[in-house]
Amino acid sequence: MDSSQHLVTFEDVAVDFTQEEWTLLDQAQRDLYRDVMLENYKNLIILAGSELFKRSLMSGLEQMEELRTGVTGVLQELDLQLKTKGSPLLQDISAERSPNGVQLERSNTAEKLYDSNHSGKVFNEHPFLMTHMITHIGEKTSEDNQSGKALRKNFPHSFYKKSHAEGKMPKCVKHEKAFNQFPNLTRQNKTHTQEKLCECKDCWRTFLNQSSLKLHIRSHNGDKHYVCKECGKAFSNSSHLIGHGRIHSGEKPYVCKECGKAFTQSTGLKLHIRTHSGEKPYKCKECGKAFTHSSYLTDHTRIHSGKKPYVCMECGKAFTRSTGLILHMRIHTGEKPYECKECGKAFIHSSYLTKHVRIHSGEKLYLCKACGKAFTRSSGLVLHMRTHTGEKPYECKECGKAFNNSSMLSQHVRIHTGEKPYECKECGKAFTQSSGLSTHLRTHTGEKACECKECGKAFARSTNLNMHMRTHTGEKPYACKECGKAFRYSTYLNVHTRTHTGAKPYECKKCGKNFTQSSALAKHLRTKACEKT
């Protein structure tokens, strides 16, 4: 017989069920699954060494307590014999009793016998006993019947090496059944039952039965048998449907032990935990920036490549991420699916609503360690920190002006291009920024959604409310690095620094006189002082 070794994976002949899917099967379905998997597994175990089998089997039994209990005793008995002094399986040993009380006898042929405590069947090689014991897995013993428990299977998916096992045929004393050694298991050979392997015509994977093959074929033809009753979305896997159902029910069973945040899926929790641990396993080869998720890295690499595969069919604008296109499309459709329960304001993205709600609750989670200022958004804190560091990483290629925010650069570039993509449907006025359009629309509606809790004064923009709040708190976050004088607004600081630099950017076109402030120029023009010069 050919003694060459080949790799066979149990995944080739296995049908997977998650714990959730298993609970959905009735007893008849479980019995059928058990019978099919036992047959498949026996074919592979007979080709594997005892230690390899034991490690593989026990590693897969963590979720099946009943099965682990049934198999552990057998493995302990076999361990005892393997540890006996002398050569391995075929050396004579004196009669002794295992911890389970099973008599180990010397055979007439001087070969070591292994006694199964389930049925008294005797085998002359370790792997064959393991194979035979598998047939008992799932049977109900008298002890099992008393407790109402039946042994169930949950076979591990491990790699096994096919090899030729030499020796005499193991024999079942009770049934007088001989267990012959199986031929090499390949895609061309038949199994011991003389049944041909079932082969997938698309990918050439092979399976030992038609039911396994049919389940596998779904991955190719896109069959989606599990349909959501709420929205009609279909899935090929019941576990995926269960996870999707939580979107409708609001159930979030996966809770972070650090902060209590809950998630609908375990993958969401795993990603979130990295925000606490700081783990960022996905690193960009171009710039070294690291990410918590592989998809974030994929999106990031497009910054270097300039690739923008997601194109808007309405205006032709392209995006590096599909989410960017989805959000952008809502500008054209006007869709705002996320509505605030407090004031009724709607948003195109859930994160915008989350941030908006903090205006009502007053919650500010992000605290600046330098000055103690708190922010409702993490991005607000990041931008604020640049006022301390002076960092302005985003520079205009046209004029060299730098900004601490990429969105501010994008808005600034429109000064050079003249682009005004945001147009008012009421009067046709166009704006370079979406916020400018939003503010403008309130001149038509008269809406002032942002109200001061201290004095009741209302504002059309949240930024105006934030600036107004400083009149109550006395906060002056903008300090001059030259003299230390502090100001309530950044514009005041900009004007003040010109007293140190001597810059006068505002020039009168009539007389050529320069001013440090636009208001000083406006006053100069009103008094007609330039006409006298």
Curated annotation (Swiss-Prot):
A zinc finger (C2H2-type) spans 114-136, 170-192, 198-220, 226-248, 254-276, 282-304, 310-332, 338-360, 366-388, 394-416, 422-444, 450-472, 478-500, 506-528. Residues 8-80 form the KRAB domain. SMART domains: KRAB (SM00349), ZnF_BED (SM00614), ZnF_C2H2 (SM00355). Its main location: nucleus. Gene3D superfamilies: 6.10.140.140, Classic Zinc Finger. InterPro entries: C2H2-ZF_domain, KRAB, KRAB_dom_sf, Znf_C2H2_sf, Znf_C2H2_type. Keywords: DNA-binding, Metal-binding, Nucleus, Repeat, Transcription, Transcription regulation, Zinc, Zinc-finger. Belongs to the krueppel C2H2-type zinc-finger protein family. May be involved in transcriptional regulation. This is Zinc finger protein 846. The lineage of its organism: Eukaryota, Metazoa, Chordata, Craniata, Vertebrata.
